[in-house]
């Protein structure tokens, strides 16, 4: 890497003054970091066109306080070509990361997973759901969410594909005779462990689990990207 340059992506932008922006970036070496982009709202600012989501960037910043100033931003390559549902899925991933990542805590492995996720969304739009579920599981692991999908938390026995297990937060999966929103088939748990979402029922179960697991991190405020996605999906299906 070029000295003093940092690889990163825009997660979120918001107005700071009449001429400037506060920008949340996800960077390889510093994780999520918020930078002041002075003058970025001016019509002829070189930053205006550069600070866009899904564009791999090279960044420089300065400052010693909590809020540092962006001094340079250049595209490292072309913006990833997101289309409709993939675009909203990318916004969803960005919004979740902006909420759950601790400020200036490095997640180098998750950064690589993010890059892979964005690339796959751009090139494999027919696989949006498996791509999102894979990244959500990778993100939970990076956050330290240590659930063992292959072992019963109560007995230590291996998970049986044919049995039902109930999810208990901060504990794991326990064999259960009940069937409700918190229970999962053993075969699905074993697929979660391998990030194998090729089965439609497993894919649906994975979405149910990640919503449960992410809820403590996301809080009660609804995700704006999810609302947008839900609004655009019916129109997309009608037009298709």
Swiss-Prot record:
Query: Gene3D superfamilies attached here?
Result: Nucleic acid-binding proteins, Recombination protein O, C-terminal domain
| SUPFAM superfamilies linked | ArfGap/RecO-like zinc finger (SSF57863), Nucleic acid-binding proteins (SSF50249)
Name the GO cellular-component terms. bacterial nucleoid
- Give the UniProt record's GO annotations in the biological process aspect: DNA recombination; double-strand break repair
Q: What are the protein's UniProt keywords?
A: DNA damage, DNA recombination, DNA repair
Entry-linked Pfam families: RecO_C, RecO_N
The entry sums up its family as follows: Belongs to the RecO family.
What is its biological role? Involved in DNA repair and RecF pathway recombination.
Name this protein carries in UniProt: DNA repair protein RecO
- According to its UniProt entry, this protein's organism is Actinobacillus pleuropneumoniae serotype 3 (strain JL03)
Lineage start? Bacteria, Pseudomonadati, Pseudomonadota, Gammaproteobacteria, Pasteurellales
């Amino acid at each position: 890497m070029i000295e003093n340059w940092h690889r990163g992506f825009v997660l979120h932008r918001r107005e700071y003054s009449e001429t400037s922006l506060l920008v949340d970036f996800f960077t390889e070496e510093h994780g999520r970091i918020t930078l002041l982009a002075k003058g970025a709202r001016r019509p002829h600012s070189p930053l205006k066109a550069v600070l866009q989501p899904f564009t791999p960037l090279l960044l420089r910043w300065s400052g010693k306080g909590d809020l540092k100033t962006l001094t340079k931003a250049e595209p490292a390559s072309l913006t990833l070509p997101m289309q409709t549902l993939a675009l909203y899925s990318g916004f969803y991933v960005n919004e979740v990361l902006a909420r759950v990542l601790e400020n200036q805590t490095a997640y180098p492995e998750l950064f690589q997973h993010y890059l892979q996720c964005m690339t796959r969304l751009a090139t494999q739009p027919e696989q949006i759901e498996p791509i999102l579920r894979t990244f959500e599981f990778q993100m939970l692991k990076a956050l330290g969410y240590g659930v063992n999908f292959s072992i019963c938390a109560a007995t230590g026995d291996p998970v049986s594909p044919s049995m039902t297990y109930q999810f208990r937060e901060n504990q794991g999966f326990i064999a259960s005779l009940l069937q409700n929103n918190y229970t999962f088939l053993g075969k699905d748990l074993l697929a979660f462990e391998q990030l194998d979402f090729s089965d439609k029922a497993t894919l649906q179960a994975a979405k149910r689990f990640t919503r449960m697991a992410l809820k403590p991190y996301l809080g009660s405020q609804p995700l704006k990207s999810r609302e947008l996605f839900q609004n655009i999906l019916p129109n997309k299906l009608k037009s298709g």
